[in-house]
Each structure stands twice: as C-alpha cells, then as structure tokens.
Amino acid sequence: MRVKRGLASHRRHKKYLDAAKGFRGGRSKLYRTAREAVERSWMYAFRDRKVKKREFRKLWILRINAGARMHGLSYSKFMHGLTLAGISLNRKVLADLAVREKEDFAKLAQLAASKLN
C-alpha cells in the first residue's frame, strides 16, 4: 500500500512557521528560512537566559554600592559588615531597599559600619 507523508511534513512545517509569526519577510513565510530563524532565536533565548542572571546581579551590586557610598562605605566593606553582623539578605533585596526604602537601608549601613569598627 502506498504511504503518503503529506500530513506529517505539513505539521512539521506548520510548527516552525507558527513559531516564526511576527518575523519579517521570508523568515515568516518560507519554511527553510523560518526554520533557520526560529532555531537561531532559540539559541539566543537559551544564551540570554544565562546573560540575564549576570546582568541583574551587576545591576543589584551597582545599586547597593551607590547606596553604601551615600553612607561612607564601599560595596565590599558594606557586605563584609553585614556578614559580621549576621545579616544574610540577598543582593536583590538589598538593592530594592537601597532604591525604595532608604531609611531602612541607612540603618543597615549604620549597623554594618559599627561591626567593622
């Protein structure tokens, strides 16, 4: 009996063309270029999920450093003072405090400075 494979390949093509919706030109219309574009976009997405973590950590450190320097401490001295004080807040929370809750961050900076001396 003759086996017709149109349905399987159609579904496979449709999967890539649906994923390429919103791409410009042939990248959303032609199967081969759409597949290449989609696979490349998946590579970028995988890579940038890793980069995102690094970028946010850099941003948090930058904000904590700015907040600490307003109280006469460097970032490293501030973090060391917090460790000596037994305070284990992560950088995300500390950065949020430095931006939104300046009074609370000032208390933490004061505590860190007192533990350093």
From Swiss-Prot:
Gene Ontology, cellular component aspect:
ribonucleoprotein complex; ribosome
- Origin superkingdom: Bacteria
What PROSITE patterns does this protein map onto?
A: RIBOSOMAL_L20
Q: Name one GO biological process term.
A: ribosomal large subunit assembly
**Pfam families on file:** Ribosomal_L20 (PF00453)
Q: Which UniProt keywords apply?
A: Ribonucleoprotein, Ribosomal protein, RNA-binding, rRNA-binding
**Single GO molecular function:** structural constituent of ribosome
CDD domains annotated for this entry?
A: Ribosomal_L20
* Family statement: Belongs to the bacterial ribosomal protein bL20 family.
Purpose: Binds directly to 23S ribosomal RNA and is necessary for the in vitro assembly process of the 50S ribosomal subunit. It is not involved in the protein synthesizing functions of that subunit.
Query: This protein is called what?
Result: Large ribosomal subunit protein bL20
Show the taxonomic lineage. Answer: Bacteria, Pseudomonadati, Thermodesulfobacteriota, Desulfovibrionia, Desulfovibrionales
